[in-house]
């Protein structure tokens, strides 16, 4: 490794440094007020995230995974039902389907935009299908207009997995507002990240909001009255105050990511690799900057030798995970090919062009041998 400073995948120290005093003041006030669960900070954040998405209601919860599970429960999806999910994404999407007793049906993805195709979804629909969960992978929205038209045609519910895409849009419409319910994650490395776990569900439907609020709180809509089996899944005030300190800067954070993506495109031009793309009208927020290349492993090794982080999202598609070995084998050739080619490079708003130039130099040197 050279004497150059290491470049991480995400620099949370740099991210939180300008907000430190504001966050500590907010945490001190929470300690003074001794209001830790379901308080004013959480309610304010719910309104802010719902407003960003363009819907009326937000319901905070303990994680993005819980957000998906709560959404499925609110839509009364359970044993005997099938839910269509992409195979090329984080396991939580399919995991949530299992948690409610339903069956995830894996669908292959497009190799340009990393999302399920309309044709692929339609081919997977059976009489048992109840919902579709499109994932806005890496910060790029899935084809929501097409998915919503297909869902309407077949009478299906739609849950958007927005974990990686807060602030992303299609023709000015925010993710989370297309489907019946949108689900967000506040894992620390996300575009809007907490100092721990957290999540949120958003919806335009007041009845779904009512269901979600009870389900996240032990199935209770009135203290000590428990109408259904629920969960202990609440976004605490400490995380909410941290997220609210960041929230006014989210657009700037996403702009910083898009700026870094532009620098990557400039410095990686002409190399034997595939850069991220976005359809016209799609606002990509670059949770990850993911390239495709045949020499993926060699490049990853070379970057590591120079103290530069990189990651493979994702090395094993969902349909090939051991936990689904009991299901009928699904063939998803695009996802299987992507798992051998994708490489995510450092991506965070504070990334500097000279850092990206250094990353590109290592990649160029490796590919040109």
From Swiss-Prot:
<dbReference type="GO" id="GO:0030170">
    <property type="term" value="F:pyridoxal phosphate binding"/>
</dbReference>
<keyword id="KW-0663">Pyridoxal phosphate</keyword>
<dbReference type="InterPro" id="IPR000653">
    <property type="entry name" value="DegT/StrS_aminotransferase"/>
</dbReference>
<keyword id="KW-0443">Lipid metabolism</keyword>
<keyword id="KW-0808">Transferase</keyword>
<dbReference type="InterPro" id="IPR015422">
    <property type="entry name" value="PyrdxlP-dep_Trfase_small"/>
</dbReference>
<dbReference type="InterPro" id="IPR015421">
    <property type="entry name" value="PyrdxlP-dep_Trfase_major"/>
</dbReference>
<comment type="similarity">
    <text>Belongs to the DegT/DnrJ/EryC1 family.</text>
</comment>
<dbReference type="InterPro" id="IPR015424">
    <property type="entry name" value="PyrdxlP-dep_Trfase"/>
</dbReference>
<dbReference type="Pfam" id="PF01041">
    <property type="entry name" value="DegT_DnrJ_EryC1"/>
</dbReference>
<comment type="pathway">
    <text>Bacterial outer membrane biogenesis; LPS lipid A biosynthesis.</text>
</comment>
<dbReference type="GO" id="GO:0016020">
    <property type="term" value="C:membrane"/>
</dbReference>
<feature type="modified residue" description="N6-(pyridoxal phosphate)lysine">
    <location>
        <position position="190"/>
    </location>
</feature>
<keyword id="KW-0441">Lipid A biosynthesis</keyword>
<keyword id="KW-0032">Aminotransferase</keyword>
<protein>
    <recommendedName>
        <fullName>UDP-N-acetyl-3-dehydro-alpha-D-glucosamine 3-aminotranferase</fullName>
        <ecNumber>2.6.1.122</ecNumber>
    </recommendedName>
</protein>
<comment type="function">
    <text>Aminotranferase involved in the synthesis of 2,3-diamino-2,3-dideoxy-D-glucopyranose (GlcN3N), which is a component of lipid A in some species. Catalyzes the amination of UDP-2-acetamido-3-dehydro-2-deoxy-alpha-D-glucopyranose (UDP-3-oxo-GlcNAc) to UDP-2-acetamido-3-amino-2,3-dideoxy-alpha-D-glucopyranose (UDP-GlcNAc3N), using L-glutamate as the amine donor. Other amine donors, such as alanine and glutamine, can substitute for glutamate, but product formation is slower.</text>
</comment>
<dbReference type="GO" id="GO:0009245">
    <property type="term" value="P:lipid A biosynthetic process"/>
</dbReference>
<keyword id="KW-0444">Lipid biosynthesis</keyword>
<dbReference type="GO" id="GO:0008483">
    <property type="term" value="F:transaminase activity"/>
</dbReference>
<dbReference type="GO" id="GO:0000271">
    <property type="term" value="P:polysaccharide biosynthetic process"/>
</dbReference>
